[in-house]
Amino acid sequence: MKDLTKGRPSVLILTFALPIFLANLLQLTYSLADTRIVGTFLGDNALAAVGATTTLSNLIVQFLMGMCNGFAIISAQCFGAKDMDRLRRSLGNSLVLGLLAAVVLTIGGLVFLQPILRFLNVPENLLNTATQYVSVIIAGLVVTLLYDVLAATLRAIGDTVTPLIVLAVSVVLNIGGDLLLIVVLHMGVLGAAVATVLSQLIAVVVCAVYLWKKYEILRIRVDDLKLQDGGMLRNMLSSGLSMGFMSSLVNIGTLTLQTSINKLGQNIIIAHTAARKISEIFMIMFSVFGQTMATYCGQNLGAGKIERIRRGILLATGYTCIWCTLNIVTAYTIGDWLVWLVTGSKTPEVIYNATLYLKVDTLFYYVTAVICIVRNSMQGLGERIVPLISSSLEMIGKIVIAATLVPMFGYPGVIAAEPIVWFIMIIPLLMKILRMPVWKQKT
């Protein structure tokens, strides 16, 4: 456990963020390896089928992850206030609420999958392959949820190392499972999806056993599973649904944009898939410091240490801006090589469009870096509405661009989408946080 209410914020934030960074990097490394394995052994059609549905699976998975991170903010506040009974109860309630959400999403996702894929304009020749892949991912949502709850709770009490170790084991098993099921057993994209779910299941078991043995304060009892604390339930639903919907709104906009991308042909789908995979690595530190600040602000708010919160937000923003500069240099020097590394494709249209995406979007990363830090800090401080408004603006912006710029300009319209919406999103966030009592209050 790590208490973020004591010690130098500059050091605490970095040491807390490092394991999260390595965990996210491992996850993205698996994603890239999965893409390369599918592209190399199953071909462009299979890669395009997975790429055309990635946004849909991300929409569902990111909602659950966001919701669990929202629940964990309440856990972090309980830990900061040194209220261990409420901390344990928050874990029990997180499991119950999360499982209910996962079951509903699983049933709804499987029932309406075909209409959704057709709405996304998934090409007819890719539809069966795409359905196989996404069906397994959706069927495994309960497993995904359990891991997210356990990992988020561990981070809430300052333990970012254990989720990293568990994830490392999961990633190795996942890549090994891909090679076994795809290359040896010839299960196609179905094998890739099955390997993902099975590796997550092993991660859940390992994480649960470790948590039970290591942290006596988190050994939940039957009473902790009862949704009987009205105040806690309201706070958890408010925080969890806010962060879940915040992630979903972002992904709904991206999903709508994907419907336009799917009309631009197989090479553009592959190019965009590659560009997004690489940009996820480029933007990894935004998510890392965002998660860090949600926990950091939650613990320090619970302890009533306001000045530490302000200083932490400024430090995290500075760290991410340094990372932005490194991203720009990378995109302009080896961007095309990275595209080839991810896809294995030498098609000029794929290389050119994916590289163009990276070169343009990285120039505006400073804006989205501030967005991620401020938005997650506000969630940690209990502000739910404005981050949702900001995410809603992103969703609306992407929908409008999908309907206007993409039909007019093709893929360059897609490339312009995110920089445009980032500038729109940042306005309400800055207006709100600069007015918040926690920012103005003097200590």
What role is predicted for each listed range?
Residues T15-D34, V136, S170, S199-A203, ...:
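Transmembrane helical elements of multi-pass membrane transporters/channels
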Residues M1-A17, S75-G140, V184-L241, C297-F364, ...:
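Short alpha-helical transmembrane segments in multi-pass integral membrane proteins
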Residues L14, L18, Y30, M67, ...:
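Residue-level signal for transmembrane alpha-helical positions in Major Facilitator Superfamily
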Residues L4-L42, T55-G70, I74, L99-T106, ...:
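N-terminal transmembrane alpha-helices
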Residues T29-A48, L117-E124, L180-M187, S248-K277, ...:
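Helix-terminus/linker motif at the lipid-water interface of multi-pass membrane proteins
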Residues I20, N24, R36, I73, ...:
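Transmembrane alpha-helix boundary and packing residues in multipass membrane permease domains
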Residues C68, V136-R155, P163-V171, A192-C207, ...:
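Short runs within selected transmembrane alpha-helices of multi-pass transporters and secretion channels
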Residues L47-I107, T144-P163, A271-T330, G335, ...:
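Small-residue-rich hydrophobic transmembrane alpha-helices
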